[in-house]
Amino acid sequence: MGPDRRIVAAKPRVHEVASELGVDSKIALAKLKEMGEFVKGPSSSIEPPVARKLRAALEAEGHLPGAGGDKTAAQASPAPRPPRPATADGSGAPKPQAPMSVAERQAAAEKAASEKAAAEKVAASEAADAKPAAGAPADTAKPSSPPRPSGVSAPRPGNNPFASNQGMGQRPSAPRPGNNPFSSSQGMGQRPSPSNIPRPAPPRPGSPRIGAPRPGGGQRQGGGGRPGFQQRPGSAGGGAGGGLQRPGGAGAGGFSGPRTGGGGGRGRGPGGGTAGAFGRGGGKSKARKSKRAKRQEFEMREAPSLGGVTVPRGDGGTAIRLRRGASISDFADKIDANPASLVTVLFHLGEMATATESLDEATFQILGEELGYKVQVVSPEDEDKELLEGFDIDLDAELEGESDEDLEIRPPVVTVMGHVDHGKTRLLDAIRSANVVEGEAGGITQHIGAYQVWTEHEGIERAITFIDTPGHEAFTAMRARGAQVTDIAILVVAADDGIMPQTIEALNHAQAANVPIVVAVNKVDKPEANPAKVRQQLTEFSLVAEEYGGDVMFVDVSARNNIGIQELLDAVLLTADAGLDLRANPNKDARGVAIEAKLDKGRGAVATVLIQSGTLRVGDAIVAGTAYGRVRAMADENGDPVLEAAPSRPVQVQGLSSVPRAGDTFIVTEEDRTARQIAEKREAAERNAQLAKARKRISLEDFTRALEEGKVEALNLIIKGDVSGAVEALEESLMKIEVDDSVSLRILHRGVGAITESDIDLATIDNAIVIGFNVRPDVKARERAAREGVDVRFYSVIYNAIDDIESSLKGMLKPEFEEVQSGVADIREVFRSSKFGNIAGVIVRSGTITRNAKARVIRDGVVIADNLAIESLRRFKDDVTEVRTDFECGIGLGKYNDIQVGDEIETIEMREKPRV
């Protein structure tokens, strides 16, 4: 049997496939749903691979093609061809077939396919025996055709109603102009031929035909008769084209491969365009396909379909690595798919997104599970590592390649952590003999400070680098970015307060960073101090003091009275010497981390950096996060200029293009261009990650519900601060505020430095509130804000800003109302009035009855009428506004008259419910 020709359309519809198999469309739709295909209805078109899968599934259940299928197949495709005989030895019998007429095709719907094929084969064989074919020399040369006697070059006129030489005797002629609207020779009296080849003359009887098949040749592309029909054996090759046809041409009278040597007729071969004496169009003409087109066609045929689109599938274990903030286009490039198809698949999964929109990891996980891929979103550290490897920078390889001769001892880096107001900064002031606390607003540390202190330990002057953090936010951010800058953590606990929630949180962060801890029990000079209680409480968190048999050093100190400071420094150095290998290579380009950064009006971007390895010098090209530039000047914590900084040395660096974030790593590059390119790529990656983070996932149901209920309220903010660490801590704290799903918080812009006109312009466009943290607007920005009515708020304490924003968010919530009973009256009498209707004579049993109040009528404890209004309220023929308990009055309920003696009238009012 030939190939399956039941599907004639490129994308058949569901009802066509169902009709072909003789099943109901609902059964086909149910089967498609079981197969995981998303199809709306019977008129939906499906891809050919899906149609094949559907047909195979239905046939496997016993739904074989019946009457409906026969009819569809007969109307949609030509008659099936008989099997070809073997032609290897050249002795096989010919395969003559007579073309089917219109009547035959109509009758085919009523007969069985096997009976049709047998009848046609017998009729064709008899006709072939009666009329031997002409052109014996050419036919003899063809292996698939037996030798034929030459003598008659054309069949008897009138023998074949579909032959191109019908009624023309032995002389073939061109098709009549206008007979076939699809013919290439329409309106012309001659057959088409190439311009450089003369038009062939009609063949003489007994002479070889011009259009005879080539020896051993097969079918030309696009040649042959009508689909499913073969030329009559021995008919003259009167059709235009023939052997002189260009490759890929579709002239009438082409040949159908190794089947017969006939050539007359206007039809085309399988896949041809023009066909039939009555102008019935055949299939689309096929040109010669390139290898790429054939490969794409094969891949499309083999690819599975989902949601009406064709997408490649994985085996469930194929890993796809994506960067943060990747889009559907990036995922499509990884799996070699069409982004539009993935958008459709994601839509059917309940997620709406564009092809270029940055998506979060959860969305890619859903899409990957559906398609059989394991999606892995690289972490920020791995992403930055891969980015640097693109510039031939491998920090891990540098550390592994260092030998012991290159390493030198460096000072330990110590981070002071603890609960708010437990004396962290006061302790550092005592160590440095300074007074930083007085400079902080409210006595709360809101900046990160880095200092280096020299102390004498066992007769040797040694340096210790201290980092003072504002609570735990900055330390969390550093740990999240892999900036392990801390060697030792000092946990400050007040002896009078003991363990507090933030103490536990700081302890957890220090243990997660895997750094040794030294506990400083502060405020031991207070009368209510209880250091033993602190030691006992910390044993629950695996911090056992040495005097209790543990390995953690506890030191009792008093920062105010300068008690135990030297003992604390000795404990830090002993802990560092006992369990840490504090060495670094100073003889290479500097590597480190930005501790803090700010925008100075005279000096520009100033970053406090801590060198971890190498030596930083003035003039080096440096990149820190998304900021880059050359080191123009360096200074220590006291403001003294520094020409070079060794490992574990904190310095202030000037010359960066922008303000880096707290915790950003910095490296020294050979050229400014390299630093700029790294910064630009980091900025692009960070922007995509922020877009994916800010994107709110919404399902189709949520989207419909939002449309019905109205838009979601949003509070837009612009944050400007003096240092990047404070801005970041404020942003993280604000994003943690949870009020209600109907109100959202959007931070449009955050930055370091004074409030500028551009900030006011952005706030004007998006109706945003500008928050200035320890910064003020310039004169022009202040005037612009007053003119545009932009709300600009200034804060110096971070907690005040958080409280105000939370109050603003609660104020944006839609008020919640609760129903409160205001009064109850019993009906004692009903007065009927033709003008006012029924009037209830009542006595107020409790509360107050107010005119125009909402009311309901209760009869035997059942509400029989609700949402009424007290339209009239009278007492002794006087209109009154309210009637109190134990007083009588008359109540008119407007058009509602179904009241009886003994009913109750209850008045209610809606009061706004205060939010907790």
From Swiss-Prot:
Residues 195-206 have a biased composition (Pro residues). Residues 58-317 are annotated as: Disordered. Residues 409-583 form the tr-type G domain. Residues 418-425 are annotated as: G1. One of its GO terms (cellular component) is cytosol. Residues 468-471 are annotated as: G3. Residues 558-560 are annotated as: G5. GO terms for molecular function: GTP binding; GTPase activity; translation initiation factor activity. It is found in: Cytoplasm. Residues 214-227, 235-282 have a biased composition (Gly residues). Residues 120-142 have a biased composition (Low complexity). Residues 522-525 are annotated as: G4. Residues 443-447 are annotated as: G2. GTP binds at residues 418-425, 468-472, 522-525. Its main location: cytoplasm. One of the essential components for the initiation of protein synthesis. Protects formylmethionyl-tRNA from spontaneous hydrolysis and promotes its binding to the 30S ribosomal subunits. Also involved in the hydrolysis of GTP during the formation of the 70S ribosomal complex. PANTHER family: TR-TYPE G DOMAIN-CONTAINING PROTEIN, TRANSLATION INITIATION FACTOR IF-2-RELATED. This is Translation initiation factor IF-2.
